[in-house]
UniProtKB/Swiss-Prot annotation:
Belongs to the thioesterase PaaI family. GO terms for molecular function: acyl-CoA hydrolase activity. This is Putative esterase AF_2264. The keyword Transferase does not apply. InterPro entries: Acyl-CoA_thioesterase_PaaI, HotDog_dom_sf, PaaD, PAAI_dom, Thioestr_dom. It comes from Archaeoglobus fulgidus (strain ATCC 49558 / DSM 4304 / JCM 9628 / NBRC 100126 / VC-16). The lineage of its organism: Archaea, Methanobacteriati, Methanobacteriota, Archaeoglobi, Archaeoglobales. Pfam families: 4HBT. Keywords: Hydrolase. Its EC number is 3.1.2.-. It comes from the Archaea.
Amino acid sequence: MRCSVTKFFCSTAKKSQMVERVKDYMYKNDKLFELLDARILEMKEGYAKVEMVVKKEHLNAANVCHGGIIFSLADLAFALASNSHGKLALAIEVSITYMKAAYEGEKLVAEAKEVNLGNKTATYLMEVKNSANKLIALAKGTVYRVNEDFPPTS
């Protein structure tokens, strides 16, 4: 009994360390964080939450947040969640539906949740909400899980 409890805690600690390594690596190396001025709010295996504030440079010709910016925020959460297992995950399909416009000055939060984890593929649902907790966009993405450690060790 004692051995299995120790194994559980060791395994949980290793998973937590892996998530932190992925989080740190992605934040430092994915230039989209800097471009969007986005930050990671929360991350664990199969889950991530990121936020940004809509700025003037994020607006389209209709003076609302460009759909590509909203998609990019959802994609950041998707990338974090899908790579959180320490195995390189590359998007093979992503779709998004926009529900509501976002405006300059609004805080947007994207949350990615794992709905299926297989050996080769995994699927995630992403929601983007504003500070009033209104749904701005809903996305679904699938990744191919490459047989490579992530982040790279070298």
